[in-house]
């Protein structure tokens, strides 16, 4: 497909995504067809989509800047740092939390295949194979009842687990840990860009993270051209509100036990 076709699809998807987020973009929809013949026109339309205001009838409070997020938090929740546990107790809990997330990834990974099912579908497959309630990793019999299987099933089903198979839920936690180990709490977006380029294969990330990593790589090819990493997340990135932001946050909670406000600030950054 031509670059104009690809860009046109991205801008159309971006417009629809911003509509779902409550932005007033309907007046821009007729411009899609007019802009389709020019990459410059599509890029200009994308900028207008980004700058569109929130609809006046949007019923949700969803601030974008950190201080507004903090101001919208439940005022009854503690934000200041406190130490109620010893270093040894904290270490044990953080280790347990991380290893539990690894085990959970292994447990769910064989089932992560379209069409995606919910708890009732999982229950039905487990009951059909005589394995409900679940007390172990997914078996071949349960996958057969499920009717589809993730390609990783050969390394994540019962009797085949020899290591933790690569998974983005685990990878982003490790990336966050490495970032803090290497750069401390004052890390920058540039530090994160460099870390991702050095450690994160593009095929092991999805959606908006893949888009950002692709742009990070392209920036390396043209170091003399300016770039705005803040813009990467919110422009020409129609999957920007997929679940990646949630699975990237764990490491900052682990790194700031007893200090939820600092953890939130690091995760926001």
Language model: regions and residue ranges:
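Structured, active/binding-site neighborhoods that engage oxygen-rich ligands
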Residues: 1-269
